Each structure stands twice: as C-alpha cells, then as structure tokens.
Amino acid sequence: ESEQHIIDVIQPQILTLQMSRLQHAPDANVVDYMKANMEQTAAIQKVSDDACFRFLYPMVKGGVNPMRMLDKDLMTRRMQADADMMRAAYGKNRHTVTQAEREAAVEDVRPIMKALADKYGEDIQLLQMPEKAAGKEKLSCDMVQEMWAKVLALPEQKAARVIRLAVSELE
C-alpha cells in the first residue's frame, strides 16, 4: 500500500474517534487538543497552503503525513495532547454534554461567526463546504485558524463547549 493510501484511509478514522471522545473530555483537555491542532496547522501552512488545506480537510483532497513536515517537539506535543484528551474522556472527570451547554455554545460562537462573515463575506461558506475551496486553499486555512484563535481566546469553559459543538457537527 502507498503511504498516501494508508493516510487517506486511516486519518478520517482517527479524526472520527477523536471527535467522539472530545464530547466527553474535560474542558482543559479539549482546549489543549485544539491549541495543539492549531499550532500544527500553522506550522504545516508554513510548508504550503495546499498542505495546510489537506491537513485540515483530508477527505477533500487527501491528507498529509504531518511527521514529514513538522519538527519532533511539535509532533510530540500534539500526540501528548491527543493521548491526554482520549484518556481523560474515559476518566473520573468525564464530561457529559447537555442541551443547555450546546445552546450556550451557539450563543458563544455567534459573535465570532458574525465577525468572520463581516470580514470574509460569502467565502465564510468554505468553512462548511471545503469541497468548494479549490483555488482558495490559503483563504480556507486562514479562516479556520482565525476562527479557532477567536474561540481559544474565550474563557476555557466557553472555548471547550464551542469546540465540542463544532466537532459534533462533523460526526
């Protein structure tokens, strides 16, 4: 099997598992997971906008092997954040998402999405429809990072519930 084929089969499966575990991980682990993910995204975008897009949306154009693009320290931090989050999702401080939390997350994210819509106009739709982003890979990567930077600037509890809401819509 080619490395690319293996990446394209396994990455979406890992992502699906992580998204489901994020729903049960404590706030601090959820926020750390997303911070590590965004640190990795920024580093991959320095390699190329196309690599960044493939990293964020492996299902659209095929994924990338981050091990080939990132320094060992960054990969280690990311893998540690992933492992901590997955473990904590089964731990004694396991989180349960409530309807009230989901509703609060919608309110928390509304001003962020409005600010992005004001800045990017119709292109904001690429966040929901990355398959339409051909030729706009840089813009897509920039918008994703700007959105998560704004979310991660929220207090931890709010940031965690927005992250859980956003990834629950990917499941």
Regions found by a protein language model. Give the residues of each.
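N-terminal Sec/ER secretory leader and immediately downstream segment
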Residues: 1-62
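Structured segments of extracytoplasmic/periplasmic soluble domains
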Residues: 13-20, 112-119, 154
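A cross-kingdom marker for long, charged
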Residues: 121-171
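Extended aliphatic helical segments
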Residues: 9, 30-31, 44-47, 60, ...
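Extended amphipathic alpha-helical interaction segments
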Residues: 42-131
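Generic structural signal for hydrophobic core residues of well-folded globular domains
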Residues: 18-22, 37, 60-63, 89, ...
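Alpha-helix capping and helix-coil boundary motifs
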Residues: 1-7, 26, 48, 98-101, ...
